[in-house]
Amino acid sequence: MQTTTLNWDTVYAVPIDIVNEAIKFKHPTPEQFELLDGKYGDCKGSFQEWQIISGGDGGNIRLKIPIKNFKANVIGKYLSGTGGFESANLEIQVKLKYLPHFPKSKNKNEELVDLKIRTKSNNAEDPAIIIIPTSEDVKGFYFNEDVRSLLMTEDDQFIMNYFHRLIKEWLERNLYFFNYVFNTVNLNLYISNNEKWKWTKPSYVDYAYSEIDEDLSKSILGVLCMTDGRKGSKNQQQKIDPNAIPKTSQSGFLISEDRLLKNILLPTIPKKFPKSKGDEFEVVNQSAQGGTYSYILKLKEGKKINLDNINACGYTCTPYIQEMKVSLLGNYLRLESTTRVDLPLGVSSICETMCEYRFKLDKNDKGEQTIAYEQIGSPTNKQYTEKTQDVSFEIIKGLLIATLGFVLELVPGIGSFLAVALIGGTLVGSISLIPNFIENYNVNTAPSIDLSLENSVSEITWNSSDIFNLNYVALAGPLQLGGTLQVQNT
């Protein structure tokens, strides 16, 4: 299943039922509430545990607030009296906000921010609290000693609206009492340049909610991050893709295509070629069908990478990679390369290679989890020749006779290209290693994915002693990691 980070560097997605489980562990809900001198009277009652429910989207989060033993003295323009109910569920819509962690960390290398309910708003079109009217689950409703034993009437709903106004007024004054931290993110001020996976550390953060099938075990709350010192902009939407979590995992972590190519693949490719200077490659964002963009890691225009010398008919030649690109194609990546050798006969032999890979989870010799590459099918090789100088076939044939010790008969329509194909056959041995270089530079040389989790996932805590157990890695547009988040009771 394909997914997207929606232009964020990384996305950490957790199902809502796990978030609610963490809320229960902390018991942040105030037990009692009382409003005095309200605009529409007075009220009091008790709360049970608040929980996230279905109905939100993007930055909007809906909460269910169970209320017990509610009593009110209503003073309204069209209604006055005393009433209440034994129990009811109030639904509200709120937004969250990242705020500086309290108490402030004494570690100068940390900048902790907490995701909490936004308690204030100066924008009338974007209030801190929106009441979602409902009369479901109302039990023991009464007003002016008139107890309703049957279904609530329209008049009863009118009275309930006054009750809602009173509760909303208390919430607007006291919402900060629900002092729950949904998660804490460490926006690291200091990052060691020698540290592997350092680029995964968050430097800017936001959140988003995505509802899936009105199912809290599928709906997700996500932490959206820019990393390695980058900040957010209008290109980053406050949304999370509903497919951010792999089907086989409980929680998910995404690394964008741009970061995957620039920070995972780009540093590894030059190391495979001893004669590479390390600056020959770049990541470009090229347009694709439907107005979308795709990231490609490619050899820069005008650059080449020399390979080991070969001996062809007594001549020492240096084959070189003329073109190379790595493309992300949905759930796999494709490596395409063009390798060339220019022979002193006025002709060149060229080999085009294409191979494809999937990502998988593996372990290195140290027992650390790491990202590995698995080849799909067999590489394809296309070999051909080009005449680069105006050299007669008789001269080439003479060289072949002198160096190879056999007579090459002229084949009409092929000429010197047939001759150079024999010489260029030596090239195949050199470039045959190219389809395997990703696999060779694989498990034991790639940095441990544990370090990625340490610098990314572990910098985002949903409770004070989270454990994220990784069990899945694949390409799904971005690089998708899946695992199980264990939120422990502390």
Curated annotation (Swiss-Prot):
Assembly with partners or alone: Part of a crude toxin extract that includes BoNTA2/NTNH, P47, OrfX2 and OrfX3; OrfX1 was not detected.
A Pfam family matched in the record: Clostridium_P47
Signal peptide: none
Keyword Acetylation carried by entry: no
Superkingdom in the source lineage: Bacteria
Coiled coil: none
InterPro entries referenced in this protein's UniProt entry, alphabetically: Clostridium_P47
Presence of keyword Zinc-finger: no
Organism the protein comes from: Clostridium botulinum (strain Kyoto / Type A2)
Protein name, as recorded: Protein OrfX3
Keywords: Virulence
Family indicated by similarity: Belongs to the TULIP P47 family.
PTM info: Shorter forms of this protein are seen in vivo.
Gene name tied to this protein: orfX3
Inducing factors: The toxin locus has divergently transcribed operons maximally expressed during early stationary phase. This is part of the orfX1-orfX2-orfX3 operon. A longer botR-orfX1-orfX2-orfX3 operon is also transcribed at lower levels. The crude toxin extract was isolated from cells that had been growing statically for 96 hours (at protein level).
